[in-house]
Amino acid sequence: MTYKSDAIKLACSLISKGKIDQAGSVIDGEYPFVPLIKGKRSYTPREMTKVFISDGFIDRYRGTKLIYPPALRLLSIYLPKQFPYHKNGKMSEAHIGYWELFPTIDHLVPIARGGKDEESNWVCCSMLTNSIKSNWTLEELQWELKPKGDFHEWNGLIHWFIQQVHSDEKQLENSYIKRWHKTALDCAGDIRRFTDIGVSY
């Protein structure tokens, strides 16, 4: 196996000897240029919720517990000073929990690296981890994919969110809360598969 740094070293050595064509062949063969293709799309709350539930609200790259997005938003509504929210994600004005604990969908194999935009290539991770991973592969980052979480042990507070909105229905006046609440109910079938025993909140 030729390390990428070794390929560069060899190419530089060949250049010093005036062997430009050979240097080019080394790069073409050992460390070729592959243009990154930008590929980004928005996912519906339902698509995201299904992935979050399937992965057990666990960051599949770090193994940390994550929180159902509207549960964090609801927390900010009740505790605006202690857990501030910013609609544009301004880090100087929003709680760090919106990056550390907020789940999103990531492409296991980045679209820019030839990955497919399909469920088999989707995993749950935090906004923070998603930002770090960017268009890199797990091999390049020397990361490993963590096992899915156990929904019986951790449900991302999705049950708390549903129950709290049911007990405080005025929160449905907030369009974000209303949209995600409907999504949670629409995904009841996915949730029910994991609720045959007690679930911690």
Show the residue positions of the predicted features:
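Short flanking/linker segments adjacent to small metal-binding domains or redox-active Cys/His motifs
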Residues: Q163-Y201
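Domain-level detector of nuclease and nuclease-like folds
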Residues: L141-E144
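Short cysteine-rich loop/turn motifs with clustered Cys
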Residues: P45-F102, S126
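Short beta-strand-alpha-helix junction that forms the catalytic/metal-binding core
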Residues: G56-D59, Y98-D106, P110-S131
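A boundary/linker detector
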Residues: M1-K50, G56, G63-P69, V199-Y201
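Short Cys/His-rich "knuckle" micro-motifs
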Residues: P69-L72, S134-L138
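Short Fe-S-cluster ligation motifs
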Residues: K87-T104, P110, H152-Y176
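A generic secondary-structure signal for well-formed alpha-helical elements
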Residues: L66, T129-K133, G149
